[in-house]
Regions:
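Short, Lys/Arg-enriched segments at the junction into DNA-binding effector domains
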Residues: 3, 114-160, 164-168
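Conserved sequence signature across two-component system core domains
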Residues: 7-8, 31, 49, 99
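Charged docking surfaces used in two-component/phosphorelay signaling
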Residues: 15-23
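Short hydrophobic/Thr-rich beta-strand motif most characteristic of the beta2 strand and flanking loop
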Residues: 25-32, 40
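Acidic catalytic/metal-coordinating carboxylates
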Residues: 32-36, 59-62, 86
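Active-site beta3 strand of CheY-like receiver
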Residues: 44-50
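Receiver (REC) domain active-site loop signature in two-component systems and cognate sites
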Residues: 55
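Basic, amphipathic DNA-recognition helix from helix-turn-helix-like DNA-binding domains
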Residues: 65, 69, 74-133
Length: 171
């Protein structure tokens, strides 16, 4: 069963989202601070994070930055700010999707399901392959590194996943 982590300081909203995704056979944990969320991500495996921007202490952007240092799972951000600057900042920092509060719960659930579907399908495709070889380029899936004639490189998680995705389309 797929499992998501909801990080938001609004406990009632977390409980509502948890109940809503459970009706779609998706398990959910929630926590109310960015630090708690980072700890849960170290302890358990999730297929998606739902992350609020406006939280006391470590805000959603800082939390997103920390998550992206270690993890490439999909992240859906939301906020009550309805300005394009926040949306663009979140997407550029590594969020996969962005919703503005108030949002329609059915739309949120559909976006969550869509992101999980793409993530799990992508991981199933690469699960059987250890290395991809192209003319002058080798992608090592086990070590998450890229080798060219100029040497071996470790890319940030999002960039590695994008390169891998584009390579799989090429095959």
């Amino acid at each position: 069963m797929n499992k998501i982590l909801i990080i938001d300081d609004d406990r009632e909203l977390c409980a509502l989202i948890k109940r809503s995704v459970q009706s779609e056979h998706i398990e959910a944990d929630f926590c109310n601070t960015g630090k708690e969320g980072l700890q849960k991500l170290k302890e358990q495996e999730y297929q998606l994070v739902v992350l609020d921007v406006m939280m006391p202490g470590m805000d959603g952007f800082e939390t997103l930055e920390e998550i992206r240092k270690e993890n490439s799972l999909p992240i859906l951000m939301f906020t009550s700010k309805n300005d394009s600057i926040s949306k663009v900042r979140g997407l550029r920092a590594g969020a996969d999707d962005y919703l503005t509060k108030p949002f329609d719960m059915d739309e949120l659930i559909a976006r969550i399901a869509s992101l999980i579907r793409r993530y799990t399908r992508f991981n199933q495709q690469i699960g059987a392959v250890q290395k991809l070889d192209f003319d002058g380029l080798q992608i090592d899936l086990e070590n998450r590194s890229v080798t060219t004639s100029n040497g071996t490189f470790e890319l940030p998680p999002k960039e590695f996943d994008l390169l891998l995705y584009l390579s799989l389309i090429h095959i």
